[in-house]
Design a protein with these regions (language model features):
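A short, N-terminal "cap"/entry segment at the start of jelly-roll beta-barrel domains
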Residues: 1-42, 119-120
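Conserved short histidine dyad/triad with adjacent acidic residue
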Residues: 29, 36-54, 88
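General beta-strand recognition
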Residues: 51, 68, 77, 93, ...
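Short acidic-glycine-tyrosine-enriched beta hairpin
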Residues: 72-88
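Charged, glycine-enriched surface loops/patches
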Residues: 77, 112, 117-119
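Ligand-binding loop in jelly-roll beta-barrel domains
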Residues: 88-114
Length: 120
């Protein structure tokens, strides 16, 4: 675990993520090497649909929208500045018909490793 840090956008490395449709890239800035509890980063989506059941608690802050998130039988259109709470076990679908981006914070940081998965 490390002390306080500032992550400069110019130093973030975007990595393509494996998805069934569209384009997505993730810059993970807080991972298990930095925190034992939380993870955080930025994800960019463009013309992408991701169907997923999360196995962690997550908070999203929409940086660029619109981004539609379907959960609990409804479609929620999220725009710049909106905040979304997604508890562990939520089945959802992210739909970005154009470029969208969000900051995410997750707990626990090692959700994928606990399930024997590589992070997407």
């Amino acid at each position: 675990m490390t002390g306080p840090r500032v992550f400069k956008r110019s130093e973030m490395v975007l990595k393509p993520a494996v998805t069934p449709t569209g384009t997505t890239a993730i810059a993970r800035v807080v991972d298990a090497s930095i925190s034992r509890e939380m993870g955080a980063g930025i994800e960019y989506l463009e013309d992408a649909t991701i169907d997923w059941t999360i196995t962690y608690d997550e908070v999203l802050f929409i940086l660029e929208g619109p981004l539609t998130i379907e959960f609990d039988g409804a479609a929620h259109e999220c725009n710049t500045g909106d905040i979304v709470w997604l508890p562990n076990g939520t089945h959802l679908k992210y739909i970005a018909k154009q470029r969208a981006a969000y900051f995410y914070a997750v707990h626990p940081v090692d959700w994928a490793a606990k399930q024997g998965l590589a992070e997407p």
